[in-house]
């Protein structure tokens, strides 16, 4: 099974479970959790089921395209089930069968590992899923998002697509993966990995990025004053990526780091609070009448 066949199989499986199938969000982010289909929709009492692939940029993890399993940009397959069903683990194990992994033939373990994303004020209780000794998935039950308590238990399943594919295709380097039957992962992404690593570690202009952070922050706050949740959140994501790039460059000191994280978190909280307030004013339209 090549990389894109694996994605298609997961999309088909989870759409059959009632998930709407979305596309990646078109702004840089470090994880699928930061996509508004998770970050915002996890809040409030309305049900939400969604799945999507999310290219996730983590500048500090870049290795110039030379490391077989550390990447500037990797791909996550994100599933959100709100409310979380009682059989969520069984649903997950069934999904593995769809990509050729029979749980009865492998050592699959759920290892306790609570999760936190400080920049967006989110945390949850959860587990890493280990397949024959390799982490392939993160399970999380959100407790807070945007520093707001989650009203309805939300289950998040985040598959690490590259790791899963390396296991399925039995290769030791991500760059040897078959993207389809003709093109390898390396042919698609190796040059971008080198160039993005060169940029993050050596060539990015720190002064410019500090300035951009201030501009993005100012614009996010201005838009929130006008009640524009989505455009404001876009600028929160831009702030987060600018911060991550500065952090990878080594341009942010220890005391500065806490300050920048706090600034992003405060913006994210304001966006989250406004989103919930607006949904409430709309009468939480996704709720059935009996649940309101």
UniProtKB/Swiss-Prot annotation:
Keyword field contains DNA damage: no
Annotated family: Belongs to the class-II aminoacyl-tRNA synthetase family.
Gene: glyQ
Coiled-coil parts of chain: none
Matches recorded under CDD domains: GlyRS_alpha_core
Record PANTHER family: GLYCINE--TRNA LIGASE, CHLOROPLASTIC_MITOCHONDRIAL 2, GLYCYL-TRNA SYNTHETASE
GO CC terms: cytosol
SUPFAM superfamilies attached to this UniProt entry: Class II aaRS and biotin synthetases
Reactions performed catalytically: tRNA(Gly) + glycine + ATP = glycyl-tRNA(Gly) + AMP + diphosphate
Keyword list, A-Z: Aminoacyl-tRNA synthetase, ATP-binding, Cytoplasm, Ligase, Nucleotide-binding, Protein biosynthesis
Name of the molecule in the record: Glycine--tRNA ligase alpha subunit
Keyword hit for Protein biosynthesis: yes
Entry EC number(s): 6.1.1.14
Pfam families the UniProt entry points to: tRNA-synt_2e
Compartments, record wording: Cytoplasm
InterPro entries for the chain: aa-tRNA-synth_II/BPL/LPL, Gly-tRNA-synth_heterodimer, Gly-tRNA_ligase_asu
Upper lineage: Bacteria, Bacillati, Bacillota, Clostridia, Peptostreptococcales
Quaternary organization: Tetramer of two alpha and two beta subunits.
Domain of life: Bacteria
GO molecular function per UniProt: ATP binding; catalytic activity, acting on a protein; glycine-tRNA ligase activity; transferase activity
Organism: Clostridioides difficile (strain 630) (Peptoclostridium difficile)
GO biological process terms, semicolon-separated: glycyl-tRNA aminoacylation
């Amino acid at each position: 099974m090549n990389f894109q066949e694996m994605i298609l199989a997961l999309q088909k499986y989870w759409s059959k479970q009632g998930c709407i199938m979305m596309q990646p969000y078109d702004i840089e982010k470090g994880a699928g959790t930061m996509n508004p289909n998770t970050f915002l929709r996890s809040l409030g009492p309305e049900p939400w089921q969604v799945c999507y692939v999310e290219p996730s940029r983590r500048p500090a993890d870049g290795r110039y395209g030379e490391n077989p399993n550390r990447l500037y940009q990797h791909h996550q397959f994100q599933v959100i089930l709100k409310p979380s069903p009682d059989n969520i683990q069984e649903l997950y194990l069934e999904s593995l069968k769809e990509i050729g992994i029979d749980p009865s033939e492998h050592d699959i373990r759920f290892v306790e590992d609570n999760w936190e994303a400080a920049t967006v004020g989110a945390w949850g209780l959860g587990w890493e899923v280990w397949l024959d000794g390799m982490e392939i998935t993160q399970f999380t039950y959100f407790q807070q998002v945007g520093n707001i308590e989650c009203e309805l238990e939300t289950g998040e399943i985040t598959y690490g697509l590259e790791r899963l594919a390396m296991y399925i295709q039995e290769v030791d380097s991500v760059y040897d993966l078959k993207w389809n039957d003709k093109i390898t992962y390396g042919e698609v992404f190796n040059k971008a990995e080198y160039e993005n690593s060169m940029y993050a570690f050596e060539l990015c202009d720190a002064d410019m990025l500090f300035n951009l952070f201030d501009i993005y922050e100012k614009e996010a706050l201005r838009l929130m004053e006008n009640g524009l949740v989505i455009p404001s959140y876009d600028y929160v994501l831009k702030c987060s990526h600018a911060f991550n790039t500065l952090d990878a460059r080594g341009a942010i000191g220890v005391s500065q780091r806490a300050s920048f994280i706090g600034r992003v978190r405060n913006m994210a909280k304001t966006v989250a609070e406004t989103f919930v307030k607006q949904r409430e004013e709309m009468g939480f339209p996704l709720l059935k009448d009996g649940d309101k």
